[in-house]
Amino acid sequence: MEKALVAFLVENLKKFPYQKEEFLALLKTRGIEAVDIISQRLEHPVPATYFGYGKVQEIGELLKKHNLNLLAVGGDLTPTQAKNLEEILEVTVVDRTQIILEIFAEHAHTHEGKIQVELARLMYNLPRITGLGRVLSRLGGGIGTRGPGETKLEVLRRTIRKRIAELRRELKEIEQNRKVKRSRRLEAGVPIVALVGYTNAGKSTLLNALTGAGVLAEDKLFATLDPTVRKLTLPGGQKLLLIDTVGFIENMPPLIKEAFKSTLEVVHEAELILHVVDGANPYREEQEAVVEKILTEMKVRVPVITVYNKVDLLPEPVLFLGKRAVAISARTGYNMELLLKLIEENLFWQEVTVKAVLPFAQAFKIGDLKENLKLINLEYLPEGIEVTVAGPRERIARYLGREKLEESNGEKPV
């Protein structure tokens, strides 16, 4: 196991204990032991070195004291800050984003997952090769270069940008294939339920408990990166597809969000979402709020059941309140029958047919309707485009609007 000095910049005293514990868990997952911890209270990072000058000197003394050559910073460094710290301290410096990327690289198993991780790492490293020009000799003209004046640094940058473009094209092709599979699932009429939650909340354990899937379930952060799809038959005989997704984390690095966009978007295919929360985590409320915020940002508009998992680890009973909430233990099976009942109650199994007139200005919706619902008929009228579609009520409400659903069926909002 690698050993490191861990350094934090404390911008928010209230959040610091939670952020500290989470970063130490990330390091443990990565296989790095925190030998010592140092922190500095500052409202904002110092532009050049992240920490103040005096604190940097103190960090250097601790590194020498413990004979360490690795500094792990519990925040995100700019390329300049990372370079300056490495030059001053003469050790390897890694930040929070880099640790997360290394964990992702270890846990990516599918072709898509590996592409996404490579894309994120290249986007992270591209701005960090700046400054290498001082130590790289200049190249003469040759194949792949633009002439005798091009440096190795410029060639490296160009190579990385080219690879990033290739990876983005590959991901686009994978996304198109996913859309084809999604259309087939829709034609089959099998509803989709997505498992989402903070990393290490127990989503994979729950997937295994419900379906016997045998998916890797470890007490590690980001143990699951690749979406896993499994069939589930409810007690009433209804069939559905259950999808496990990559775990969320507070302040998810933007480049990871971009690289894993297509994976995260899988929640938009779902008729129902199970938000799995680690009910025994002391920072449960903070983690729950992070996931809810991300779902809001993603404009998720389907029912969400909050599943408080790991309640068997609680020293004493806790009352979890909520209209769509259930406390369970995926490990022991506690309350799993109640969870299945809630899934049945919240999924609208009956397929309905809706006829609605769209204004011509909303003609762009036709593509979404064809892709996500059964488009039975389409007719152009003087007042707009009349469409007849069939599908689950919630999905129709999502793409046509609940008002259109109510007008067509004479129903009240659910």
Swiss-Prot record:
Subcellular locations according to the entry: Cytoplasm
Q: Where does GTP bind?
A: 197-204, 222-226, 244-247, 309-312, 329-331
* SUPFAM superfamilies per record: P-loop containing nucleoside triphosphate hydrolases (SSF52540)
Q: Which cofactor does it need?
A: Mg(2+)
What would be one Gene Ontology cellular-component term for the protein?
cytoplasm
Q: What is its main location?
A: cytoplasm
Report what the protein is called.
Answer: GTPase HflX
List the top taxonomic levels of the source. Answer: Bacteria, Bacillati, Bacillota, Clostridia, Thermoanaerobacterales
Gene designation: hflX
